[in-house]
Amino acid sequence: SSAASDVYKRQAQIQGFFDIPVDNMLGSSVLIPYIAGKFGVGTDDTVIVSPDLGSVTRARKFTQKLDMPLAIIDKRRPKANVSEVMNIIGNVEGKKCILVDDLIDTAGTLVHAADALVERGGATEVYACASHGVLSGPAIERIQNSPIKELTILDTIPLTNDKKLDKINVLPVAPVFTEAIARIYEETSVSTLFD
């Protein structure tokens, strides 16, 4: 049984530093059913997009569960805190795109990816989702002025009133924690929540 729970640690190896059992609550267990309900499963007109090479494994999990194609944004950093989209790997032309990330801080990577999908890739609509919405600095202004139709985040970080936009959708993680705690109490598998 687990003694601690966490939502979407950025590096799975962190679990090795705890002296007690830890369950990593994956944000995908909330986000994937939401996407399936909104866009369907196995649709050819919707593409899951990794906003950078570091998010490919996460995006691939979404494509497998949702039976949707994958596209990848290949970006470069010519200098610190500056990213530039070099290529879009995969077909997004005429498609709805869903950018999948773990954390959105200043939203620079996310918005550059959304711009590239529309302007260079020919995507018809862009959506985005992430487990954690830090939304610091220029994030809100960037998101508001971007082609992103809807950003869905989890309530792992409280969204203050000055950060609330009509295009930001917040999903609760409490049901996942509730189910995990019940399974820990009943001494049944927690990991099957995230398969």
Residue ranges and their predicted role:
Residues 11-30, 99, 104-105:
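Glycine-rich phosphate-binding "P-loop"
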Residues 25-43, 174-186:
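Hydrophobic alpha-helical segments within soluble ligand-binding/sensing domains
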Residues 2-7:
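Short, small-residue-biased leader/transition segments that mark boundaries at the very start
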